[in-house]
From Swiss-Prot:
Pfam families membership: BacA
InterPro entries: UppP (IPR003824)
Enzyme class: hydrolase
Source organism: Streptococcus gordonii (strain Challis / ATCC 35105 / BCRC 15272 / CH1 / DL1 / V288)
Name by which UniProt lists this protein: Undecaprenyl-diphosphatase
GO biological process assignments: cell wall organization; peptidoglycan biosynthetic process; regulation of cell shape; response to antibiotic
GO cellular component terms attached to this protein's record: plasma membrane
Keywords: Antibiotic resistance, Cell membrane, Cell shape, Cell wall biogenesis/degradation, Hydrolase, Membrane, Peptidoglycan synthesis, Transmembrane, Transmembrane helix
Disulfide pairings: none
Length: 282
């Protein structure tokens, strides 16, 4: 029944809305969930495109929440505020350059060679350990950048290079950029907010590229597939509206250690599942 497929889209949208912003890997969670819950009669080309384009719902939540801050044409902004807005966008562009120069050419290669349980599990664990170790270090080190307006262009570029590491499935785009920011002396609040903004060009760009590749390979969406995708995007948007606000408040009082522990636990479970699956497949 198509109604069941709609329910699956709702589930995928909820997972995307939560895991896109928490540094726990949306791709890793979608790979895991789709091992047990998957659409009927949908080919690999559609699912590859779906898992990326669903992110548009999540990123639109950032645009909605921060529209005033991101809009340089807001009538009541002073010239100084307009200048600050353009400077913010300039930093986002600078931070996006590594993804354009390195990420786009290597995307297919990473997709082909690392989009599997073992790779996802390993990256979940590695970054989980990284979060714990970095936060232990940061207990004795004060951040040097505590205001987004003061974020240096050099630091923005540094964070952008870390974003490229999220090409490894299981890394988490937000996880990679947050780790990069924390290592470079950026406060949790600043790097979290900058991560939200950095996702705008990257996720729109990634979605556009996936759709273009999908079409160029001779594929097309039927009404059912379009419905499944739109439902997932709408749900991801709604859930992201809450999760973004939650994480923004959370990092003001807490560190990322709990996410590190969660990543290690999930990565271990994925490895155990992979081992048992391999054993029983023989």
């Amino acid at each position: 029944m198509f109604f069941i497929e709609i329910i699956k889209s709702v589930i995928f949208g909820i997972i995307e809305g939560i895991t896109e912003w928490l540094p726990i890997s949306s791709t890793g969670h979608l790979i895991l969930v789709q091992e047990f819950i998957h659409y009927q009669k949908q080919n690999a080309a559609f699912m590859e495109m779906f898992n990326v384009v669903i992110q548009l719902g999540a990123i639109l939540a950032v645009v909605f929440i921060y529209f005033d801050k991101l809009n340089p044409f807001k009538p009541d902004k002073t010239p100084r505020q307009v200048q600050k807005t353009w400077q913010l966008w300039a930093k986002v562009v600078v931070a996006s350059l590594p993804a354009v120069i390195i990420g786009i050419p290597l995307d297919n290669w990473f997709e082909k060679n690392f989009h599997n349980f073992v790779s996802v599990a390993i990256m979940l664990i590695i970054y989980g350990i990284a979060f714990i170790l970095i936060e232990r270090r940061n207990q004795e080190v004060e951040p040097t950048v505590t205001n987004l307006e003061k974020l240096p262009y050099k630091t923005a570029l540094y964070i952008g290079f870390f974003q490229v590491l999220s090409l490894f499935p299981g890394t988490s785009r937000s996880g990679a950029t947050i780790v990069g920011g924390l290592l470079n002396g950026t406060s949790r609040s600043v790097v979290t907010e900058f991560t939200f903004f950095l996702g705008i060009p990257v996720m729109f760009g990634a979605s556009g590229i996936k759709v273009l590749k999908f079409i160029l390979k001779g594929n097309s969406l039927d009404l059912g597939q379009l419905t499944l995708l739109l439902v997932a995007m709408i749900v991801a948007f709604g859930v992201s509206m809450y999760v973004i606000r939650f994480l923004t408040d959370y990092v003001k009082k807490h560190d990322f250690t709990v996410f590190g522990k969660y990543r290690i636990g999930l990565g271990a479970l994925l490895l155990i599942y992979w081992v048992f699956k391999a054993l029983f497949a023989k």
